[in-house]
Amino acid sequence: MITGASSGIGKGLALDIAARGAKLGLLARRQSLLDEIVGAVKGRAIAVTADVRDSQAMKAAADRVREELGPIDMLIANAGIGTSSHVAQLDPDHVANVISINVLGAANSVAAVVPQMVERGQGQLVAISSLAAYRGLAKSAAYCASKAALSSYFESVRIDLRGTGVDVTIIHPGFIKTPLTAGREAKMPYLMELDDAIPKIVSAIEKRKKSVAFPWQLATVVRAGLLMPTFMYDWIAARNSFRE
């Protein structure tokens, strides 16, 4: 089951995984886009319109996927949005929406599938997080906070599920050409084509890795930022906004 499957990373994963023979429950709010993907994979998927912010809708969606396709072996929590704003112009409602979709939406998705996975003693939960989870970035307060929360949430879930047969994989990609990054004028370092990013994500899922970050060049820089003195990191980050 893939959330946020109508475009970007979610769509790319759906097409790739379906080509490998899997049956998919594709969730998003835009039915027409989901229907296009279902048509492209020739019946190996069903489209389910659902809003990840609605816990009951997510439970109903998971029930439908199980009824039509059988037990859910994997959840890919991909649904997410971003926002770009200096804190002085930040709209609290926009912040709430980002947190609601990126974090609570993932929690609702997990709650809809994990009890059955634990009962069966097998399954995999995958979170599509971001390198933005590691440290704050300029004009990205809501997005960075949501991805940091998402990564920590799934890390805690992984610890809770230790020994149950349910694995947890957290993906931390850098900049990828998707609708989320389209239209930005700022140069995004190591910007990846979607077709190059999808195999890396699928490989990590297949190997059931606990966590993966890519591209390695940008991941190395970001991790180095964790070791920098705060004054140094702030000086560098303030001069590099990727949200323009």
Where in this protein do the model-derived segments appear?
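Conserved glycine-rich cofactor-binding loop
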Residues: 6-7
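The beta1-alpha1 cofactor-binding region of Rossmann-like NAD(H)/NADP(H)-dependent oxidoreductases
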Residues: 49-60, 92
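Residue(s) in the substrate-gating loop at a strand-loop-helix junction
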Residues: 130
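C-terminal helical subdomain
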Residues: 170, 186-221
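Substrate-binding pocket helix/loop in short-chain dehydrogenase/reductase
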Residues: 86-87, 91-99
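Conserved glycine-rich Rossmann-like NAD(P)H-binding loop of the short-chain dehydrogenase/reductase
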Residues: 22-37
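Active-site helix of classical SDR
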Residues: 110, 146
